[in-house]
Amino acid sequence: MDEVKEALNDPEKYVVVQVAPAVRAALGEAFEFPIGVDVEGRMAEALRRLGFDKVFDTKFGADLTIMEESNELIERLNNDGELPLITSCCPGWIKYAEHFYPDMLENISSCKSPHQMQGAIVKTYLANQEHIAKENIVMVSVMPCTTKKFEIT
């Protein structure tokens, strides 16, 4: 959290946050909002008031991941690649497979997780659109699982 606060207070930094859909749902339950309340809008407004320059939902990254995994499957099917294709957005599961099933690693999709894909888009496309050096973009991911920290670069 200290690094996030520091970035939010640095005028040179363009701070972007992405939030997993599960977090939005959990906030709605935690604050006992009735079903149908725009939790996403309230959360985005709160994050902007905290100083984030852009607020995104990770579901866009999930769409990118699905498209890339589909392309990877087609590529493997067309070129006698390793099957079955195993996909997972869970870094904890990937670590488990690396440790206990190294013989299956060729079956695991090479695609990034949704929050990694979205981070890559922010550091390239958004940086280009907003004319910001990618080194000045700080990407913050709010995820429901602590094992996502294994994916941080």
Q: Where are the predicted features?
A:
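Iron-sulfur-associated redox domains of electron-transfer enzymes in respiratory
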Residues: D2-T153
